[in-house]
From Swiss-Prot:
Lineage: Bacteria, Bacillati, Bacillota, Bacilli, Bacillales
Protein name as catalogued: Energy-coupling factor transporter ATP-binding protein EcfA1
Keyword Transport applies: yes
UniProt family annotation: Belongs to the ABC transporter superfamily. Energy-coupling factor EcfA family.
Subunit structure comment from the entry: Forms a stable energy-coupling factor (ECF) transporter complex composed of 2 membrane-embedded substrate-binding proteins (S component), 2 ATP-binding proteins (A component) and 2 transmembrane proteins (T component).
Function, as annotated: ATP-binding (A) component of a common energy-coupling factor (ECF) ABC-transporter complex. Unlike classic ABC transporters this ECF transporter provides the energy necessary to transport a number of different substrates.
Main location: membrane
Cystine pairings recorded for this chain: none
Gene Ontology terms, MF aspect: ATP binding; ATP hydrolysis activity; ATPase-coupled transmembrane transporter activity
Gene this protein is translated from: ecfA1
CDD domains, A to Z: ABC_cobalt_CbiO_domain1 (cd03225)
Top-level class of the enzyme under EC nomenclature: translocase
UniProt domain ABC transporter: residue ranges: 6-241
Organism this protein belongs to: Bacillus anthracis
EC number: 7.-.-.-
Domain of life, source organism: Bacteria
Length: 280
C-alpha cells in the first residue's frame, strides 16, 4: 500500500468580505508516487487550495496533514514548506539567478547548505529535468518550457516530499507544455515524487493518475482520467471541456464506429483506428 503524503480533512476557507466560501469541506489524500490534477472553472477554488496547502493561508476549519504526522498551523508552517515545493505559472517571474545554476542553488544558499552538498544537489536536480547541459545559460536564452523545468529543478534541489504545480503550464506554448508534462511524468514514474497539479489544461490533466473536480469550492467528482472524462455532459454543465481525443471518439460513436477503449490522447486514438482499419 502506498504511503499517504498529504491529507486534507473538511477544510474550509472564506476570504474577508466574501459572501461565500472559496473552499468548503474539502477532503482528499495524496499518495507517494502519485500525480493528481485539480481542475475547475475560474473561481472554483483551485488556486485557494494551492495557497492553503503551502501555508500561504490557513484553513478556517478542518486540518491539513503532511507525511501523516505534521498538521499545518502557524507553528508548523515553515516545516510544512520544507516538505511542499511550489512552481507557479509565469516562468519569468520565478527566475531569480543570472544563470541556470545560480537559480537552482538560490534556495540552497538561503539555508546555508555546504558547497559540496550544494553542487551535488544542483547536478542531481538538473539531471532529473534534463537541463544539465544548460548549467551556465542565461534565462533570456531559454524557452518557456525550459525555464519551467529549471523552476522545477530549483524546487527539487530542496528535496520536498510533494511538488505543487499552480497553473505551471498555462503561459507556455504547446511544445513547452509537452516538455513540462513529460518531465512531471518521468519524476512520478522513475523517482516516486508526489505531484499535485492545479490546471485549466484538460489535456494535461488527462496524463495524471487521478483527477479532482472542484466546483464552487467543493469537490464535485474524483476519479481516474478515464472515469472523469467519460462524463463529458457533466463537465460541460459546469463550464469545462473534454480532451480533443474524447470529443473525436464521441463523434465516431455517433457514426457507429465503436472503440474498445477510452482515449485520452490523440496518439492512442489514432493507434486504435489504425488497428480497426487494418482488420478490414
Amino acid at each position: 500500500m502506498k504511503k499517504e503524503k498529504l491529507r486534507t480533512e473538511n477544510i474550509s476557507f472564506q476570504y474577508p468580505g466574501a459572501a461565500t466560501y472559496a473552499l468548503k469541506d474539502v477532503s482528499f489524500s495524496l499518495f507517494e508516487g502519485e500525480w493528481v490534477s485539480v481542475i475547475g472553472q475560474n473561481g472554483s477554488g483551485k488556486s485557494t487550495l494551492a495557497k492553503l496547502l503551502n501555508g500561504l493561508f490557513l484553513p478556517e476549519a478542518g486540518t491539513i496533514t503532511v507525511n501523516d504526522t505534521m498538521i499545518l498551523s502557524e507553528e508548523t508552517v515553515w516545516d510544512v514548506r520544507k516538505q511542499i515545493g511550489m512552481v507557479f505559472q509565469n516562468p519569468d517571474n520565478q527566475f531569480v539567478g543570472t544563470t541556470v545554476q545560480d537559480d537552482v542553488v538560490f534556495g540552497l544558499e538561503n539555508i546555508g547548505m555546504p558547497r559540496e552538498q550544494m553542487v551535488e544537489r544542483l547536478n542531481q536536480a538538473l539531471r532529473l529535468v534534463r537541463m544539465e547541459d544548460f548549467l551556465n545559460d542565461e534565462p533570456h536564452s531559454l524557452s518557456g518550457g525550459q525555464k519551467q523545468r529549471v523552476a522545477i529543478a530549483g524546487v527539487l534541489a530542496l528535496q520536498p516530499s510533494i511538488l505543487i504545480l499552480d497553473e505551471a503550464t498555462s503561459m507556455l506554448d504547446p511544445q513547452g507544455r509537452r516538455e513540462v508534462v513529460e518531465t512531471v511524468r518521468q519524476l512520478v514514474n522513475e523517482k516516486g515524487i508526489t505531484v499535485l497539479s492545479i490546471t485549466h489544461d484538460l489535456e494535461e490533466a488527462a496524463q495524471s493518475d487521478r483527477v479532482i473536480i472542484l466546483n464552487k469550492g467543493e469537490i464535485l467528482e474524483e476519479g481516474t482520467p478515464e472515469q472523469i472524462f467519460k462524463s463529458s455532459h457533466m463537465l460541460q454543465e459546469i463550464g469545462l471541456d473534454v480532451p480533443f481525443s474524447v470529443k473525436i471518439a464521441e463523434l465516431l460513436k455517433r457514426n457507429e464506429i465503436l472503440l474498445q477503449n477510452t482515449h485520452l490522447t490523440m496518439e492512442s486514438l489514432v493507434n486504435e483506428l489504425w488497428r480497426l482499419h487494418s482488420k478490414k
